[in-house]
């Protein structure tokens, strides 16, 4: 390919390159060692190693062409090639098209300029063609073949992209290729005969970060299952890192965090994920977050342009971003100017006749925006006019909007149980903010605080006259300055709606709230019970929430939201936040503000595991380490900051600050998002730094911070003294220094305003991996603690078994959209019920781990074991059930193992298994396995009732049934007390299958012959005992019974079939477990076989290394 001309010193180059062809102006060279017999000897080997380590282009392109001029030692590299054919093509083109022209130039300088210009033109032409494709299909196809050949992953594994880089093995960099696929990060290197192959699943990564050290200038650090991996020498390290970050977060959300995993068309199907799709999604998410747009919006186009700012009389340079329903602009010249134009507000789009390629967008309210220097502005104007027509048609047609798709009716949590609504449960929606109702402004008696409030209002009115008012107002640095000073009481609700983007949600969903209120009131479920419990705990000191008006409004908003979003339902702290929203916003506005906070501004905060809040706590700790290192040196345990700051994040400081100060924090939050909360948290710690450094323990530090919060005041607050929380305290504690909230917020902006949104987003992504993996580790430790009490395995063996169990669940879900394991995964369930496997997954694990997996009927054994363990017949088993079977196989006594085998051959475990494909022998297809695993054994009615009660009390996700828990616990205790006398008898067909299984288990055993003889003796002994028993119980029929003849000890299995009675007499034949046990104990060979110690540790190690391989083979 053609290269951008760069200087090369030929004197040094000749040591590593050999000349192939040359003429007056060009030289064709070949890299030493390439294309030579024996690889060019030692020199070729060293050059090849150097290329690999330094990631030289020569490693993949060992040919190049240089442009030379006479009497000069400086040459220009202009082309390179992967093979002789490619470079010869370039050489021929130069001779045919360039050489003839060069003779007309007089000076060497003109020749060089001409060649450089020609080559740059060729590169630009190639760039235009390849940009449309983004990736070279030929190269990608070649990389895909290498990926499949090197790692042998299933063909469904989708390669997203690949990069050349170095992997550090100790202190040695190994040059190779990094492949990023949907489920794995893979690296391959082959250097000097040494092969390195690394496969890391995204779901196993707990840390992913860019690092810099003395040796590694820039590298990507990956931590997986306690092992650290470093990759460096990337051509585009930022692009690589962002893509890795997206893939890791996608896997984590999909597999661990189904609760918050949104269906996304870009990520819905793991087989359709592409590099371009991921980049598009990342830009779209960033766009929505920056402009606070509804989550349904997607970024369609981006255009560089200038926007005329009328009040400043200059054009601001920035980017115009267009989505389905919005035109947005953000400056890039440091003016902090941004504009959001909803298409529903647009009246006309015109283009000017001047040469500036300008577009004028006129909106309602007699405002116009002028965008200039737009490329392809003719096409852009046509597209925008089309969008505006579509938007206006939509507005005309739909005046009523149904419940949106993400809240289709009540969830399974909502049982439609009519309630006798109390008096306060009125459906009348408040049309005024509670502050307006309970604290109307007295315009006649204006005190100093009210005068300041009026001055604030005047400042905002001046801003509105300059920048406009409403959704499409200009947002500038002046806007932020006014927000920091505190929004006036009368404008607070309006501006919260504006800055949060809730105004757009409400405008596009008219009538939605009233409909949801109507549908949700009168329902009863766990969420509504929790809401009722917390209603009177929400700002109890405020008069608005001491009356039915405020309480009813709060109930309606919270219940409506729980109905809209059953994934979240209701979470503690939502009541405190909503009560403050209701003070300043109308009821419907408060609902949409809550939607904006829970679903966009604080994602994943208000779910069962408050993952979002935990992630932001980790981000806060990271910022403390960066900005307040002396505090982290003093406070060795960083968990203190986590415990203290949780309420700060969940309630936006409302729970720790007096209400009159907290609302100023909420002002900043709606304008700046989580950045404002993090900055304020740092400012508070910085303000109290000296006190915190003298604290000896956590309790002392908490007391110091609480005392500080008690003395935060808002001296300009116009709220009456009976409402202000700070005023009462300030009288009692006058000896402590008062801190004004406005000064504190200003200080937080001055000191920590340099923290960027992009950095916070990156820290959130990075810490999300760590937080979720920590939660998963907690789940694992709790499961192991419970299970370890019932098994003989060591904790280490149990730990490894759990990892394999969970890994198999994930591997089987990697390439499928609907996996039963993921479908039933619910982090809110008890730890043991969170991860469960189906019969197909159990079969794979049985083949990997069972000491009986060598048996010819291993699929049948796996099926019967699964049916035995699946006591509640939901076709899923948890880790406790799984580990109990493995423990018996490896650590059980002779009696335990025999009892397990006996149970496998009687109902409910046993079922007749016939494979449809006789050629496969006993092997069962996935469909057959699924069919047989779901077969139900008929049981008495009373037993069915008992079985149905064995399901987890929380599986319905409704109210937790304590009685069901006690019943389940009692069942487990009874199960432990089960004796061998409680086991039912085994009939003829079951006994034949039991005998066959024993024969299969003994196959290829060192004592195979003696085991066969022993089982033949036992079988015949049992038959004779049963014959005698029959004669004793049925003397009349004894004459018709054939006399026993001793079987030959050669073929015992044929003797079993010969001596057993005909099927019509089957009901008369059966064996008790005690009979079988007593007979087997008489044969030492059988006892030795079942009591032989088995190496579980080695089996686990082998399973871990071959788990993925076994999946690809099956």
UniProtKB/Swiss-Prot annotation:
Stretch list, region Disordered: 399-420, 938-957, 1032-1061
Biased composition (Basic and acidic residues): 940-957
Keyword Repeat on entry: yes
Domain called Rab-GAP TBC: residue spans: 486-673
Alphabetical keyword list: Cytoplasm, GTPase activation, Repeat
CDD domains (alphabetical): PH-GRAM1_TBC1D8B, PH-GRAM2_TBC1D8B
Composition bias, Polar residues: 399-411
GO cellular component: cytosol
Residue ranges of every copy of the GRAM domain listed in the record: 145-212, 285-353
InterPro entries, sorted: EF-hand-dom_pair, EF_hand_dom, GRAM, PH-like_dom_sf, Rab-GAP-TBC_dom, Rab-GAP_TBC_sf, TBC1D8B_PH-GRAM1, TBC1D8B_PH-GRAM2
Principal location listed in the UniProt entry: cytoplasm
PROSITE patterns: EF_HAND_2, TBC_RABGAP
Single GO term (MF): GTPase activator activity
Stretches assigned to the EF-hand domain: 857-892
Cross-referenced Gene3D superfamilies: EF-hand, Pleckstrin-homology domain (PH domain)/Phosphotyrosine-binding domain (PTB), putative rabgap domain of human tbc1 domain family member 14 like domains, Ypt/Rab-GAP domain of gyp1p, domain 1, Ypt/Rab-GAP domain of gyp1p, domain 3
Disulfide bonds: none
Site location (Arginine finger): 533
Example GO BP: vesicle-mediated transport
Subunit description: Interacts (via domain Rab-GAP TBC) with RAB11B (in GTP-bound form).
UniProt function note: Involved in vesicular recycling, probably as a RAB11B GTPase-activating protein.
Domain notes: The arginine and glutamine fingers are critical for the GTPase-activating mechanism, they pull out Rab's 'switch 2' glutamine and insert in Rab's active site.
Annotated protein name in UniProt: TBC1 domain family member 8B
The organism of origin for this protein: Mus musculus
